[in-house]
From Swiss-Prot:
This is WD repeat, SAM and U-box domain-containing protein 1. Residues 403-476 form the U-box domain. One of its GO terms (molecular function) is ubiquitin-protein transferase activity. Keywords: Phosphoprotein, Repeat, WD repeat. Pfam families: SAM_2 (PF07647), U-box (PF04564), WD40 (PF00400). Disulfide bonds: none annotated. Coiled coil: none annotated.
Length: 476
């Protein structure tokens, strides 16, 4: 389903970053160079390597058109190159001359962002090469940055562990502690969850860090409710700091690279591990998906870049996901269940589940009676959390088996929504179910159990349109 088709071994030091355009692959290294390869045969271009930087090159990024390549370095500069000739277009000097750790283009190629070790983040006009706006974070280095698919937001990650969200004028909208030991990378899915209609924008964001975790977030923005960054889930699998993460172009897969020398590929729909790749012999520092083909590049401190190819029939395509999830859970070993418990924050129950030989099949058949009576779990809170987590697994299996996208199902009724509304917790619900919840229950979020900031329910017209389109397609 995924196979190693080529290994590039031209760099003389650690590979720090790799990036695709529609026709080229760029790699950069601590050896001060950037190398360019053709995707047709992975031959290095005649004008490669690109040489200008006087110290290690940390990041490289293509403009959306693929015509311009940006690279940044410890030497305090971000260089723009012609990807097709190798000529230097301009050299952008970071204010203060601090080492530049990361750079990326906005989706419309208007801006280039560069983040530095002194915490500064600069928005450059990518056409005039002039400094447009500046921002900074306190007491941390900027180590990650990503533009939202519409270009309206820039998210940066710091060595202190904060995700910071900026608007297109570099005004700080939000800052949140995301990873206790520091962030290493962040990446937006290019496919919006919904958006464009009535001012609603919903995007998926991934972040990873020194805490060995990958976290998934939903970034939402409406003119009425403003901006929100909502934590959704944590992907487990790595046993050491995670240094890189990247979404596939269709948003259905996420790849990550780690200090544990492995690359893990996740199915975003089921949040299950699809593949674990262990060919690198040292830390995996970077990973990137190609925009138009099923290719993945991974780079490492072993000085190599591996190119992987996926079969056309990937597990993320419709018709196979439900079967995969069903087999994935029912075939879980006792150790898989232990990993799942830890991912749910239930590590205190690992020994109890092992003692009772709970594997995937047994997990799906647990009840409140068996948890209390047979397994002697006395805490009502723990029993409730276990049952809720198991219900989520069952529900995901059922919704996928029925073919209904999970985001179309009301979290309260677990039925297809007809009149979806956005509550102040950022989640969407069926209007009637949410109104009943508010009137009969405590005024807390059904998803987080936290107090609702407001009881206002905003029609989610974009989601309603998506549901109607899905119904029209699937009821023919």
């Amino acid at each position: 389903m995924v196979k190693l088709i080529h290994t590039l071994a031209d760099h003389g030091d650690d590979v720090s970053c790799c990036a695709f355009s529609s026709t080229l692959l760029a790699t950069c290294s601590l050896d001060k160079t950037i190398r360019l390869y053709s995707l047709s045969d992975f031959a290095e271009l005649p004008h490669s390597p690109l040489k200008f930087h006087t110290y290690a090159v940390h990041c490289c990024s293509f403009s959306p058109s693929g015509h311009v390549l940006a690279s940044c370095s410890t030497d305090g500069t971000t260089v723009l190159w012609s990807a097709h000739s190798g000529h230097t277009l301009t050299v952008l000097e970071q204010p203060g001359g601090s080492p530049v750790r990361v750079c990326c283009f906005s989706p419309d190629s208007t801006y280039l962002a560069s983040g530095a070790a002194d915490g500064s983040v600069v928005l450059w006009n990518a056409h005039s090469y002039k400094l447009y706006r500046c921002g900074s974070v306190k007491d941390s280095s900027l180590v990650a940055c990503a533009f939202s698919p519409d270009g309206g937001l820039l998210v940066t990650g710091s060595s202190g562990g904060d995700l910071t969200v900026w608007d297109d004028r570099m005004r700080c909208l939000h800052s949140e502690k995301a990873h206790d030991l520091g962030i290493t990378c962040c990446s937006f899915s290019s496919q919006p969850l919904s958006g464009g209609e009535h001012g609603l924008q919903l995007y998926r964001l991934a972040s990873c860090g020194q805490d060995c975790e990958i976290k998934l977030w939903v970034v939402s923005f409406t003119r009425v409710l403003g901006f929100e960054l909502k934590y959704r889930s944590t992907l487990s699998g790595h046993c050491a700091p995670v240094l890189a993460c990247a979404f596939s172009h269709d948003g259905q897969m996420l790849a990550s690279g780690s200090v544990d020398k492995s690359v893990i590929i996740y199915d975003i729909g089921t949040q299950s591990v699809l593949h674990t790749l262990t060919q690198h012999t040292r830390y995996v520092t970077t990973c990137a998906f190609a925009p138009n083909t099923l290719l993945l590049a991974t780079g490492s401190m072993d000085k190599t870049v591996n190119i992987w190819q996926f079969d056309l029939e990937t597990p993320c395509q419709a018709g196979s996901v439900s079967d995969q999830l069903k087999h994935f859970i029912e075939d879980w070993s006792e150790e898989d269940v232990s990993k799942w418990l830890r991912a749910q924050g239930l590590e205190d129950l690992v020994d109890i589940f092992r003692t009772n030989n709970i594997d995937g099949k047994e997990l799906l058949h647990l009840t409140k009676e068996s948890l209390a009576g047979d397994m002697k779990i006395e805490s009502l809170g723990l029993r409730s959390k276990v049952l809720r987590s198991i219900d989520e697994l069952r529900t995901r299996m059922e919704s996928l088996s029925s073919g209904i996208p999970d985001e179309f199902i009301c979290p309260i009724t677990r039925e297809l929504m007809k009149d979806p509304v956005i509550a102040s917790d950022g989640y969407s619900y069926e209007r009637e179910a949410m109104e009943s919840w508010i009137h009969k229950k405590k005024r807390t979020s059904p998803m987080t159990n936290l107090a609702l900031p407001s009881l206002v329910l905003t029609p989610n017209r974009t989601l309603k349109m998506a549901i109607n389109r899905w119904l029209e397609t699937h009821q023919k």
